[in-house]
Amino acid sequence: EAGEECDCGTPENPCCDAATCKLRPGAQCADGLCCDQCRFMKKGTVCRVARGDWNDDTCTGQSADCPRNGLYG
């Protein structure tokens, strides 16, 4: 929702302050295929294994999202 940096529905999330819906100090992310222990995963880390003729999707190192690369192998 507007103004939220993370989903504050789960108080046990170590990356997100459940009271403010803001990332905790030092956290880059709270969830996502490219988020590990509150930090963005390294660029090139496989976040979605290829199916068929497609290449693996990899993290950018700048976001918790796992972008589709859309390239054939």
From Swiss-Prot:
SMART domains: DISIN. GO terms for cellular component: extracellular region; plasma membrane. Its main location: secreted. One of its GO terms (molecular function) is toxin activity. It holds the Pfam family Disintegrin. Disulfide bonds join 6-21, 8-16, 15-38, 29-35, 34-59, 47-66. Keywords: Cell adhesion impairing toxin, Disulfide bond, Hemostasis impairing toxin, Platelet aggregation inhibiting toxin, Secreted, Toxin. The keyword Disulfide bond applies. A motif (Cell attachment site) lies at residues 51-53. Monomer (disintegrin). The disintegrin belongs to the medium disintegrin subfamily. This is Disintegrin cerastin. It comes from Crotalus cerastes cerastes (Mojave desert sidewinder). The lineage of its organism: Eukaryota, Metazoa, Chordata, Craniata, Vertebrata.
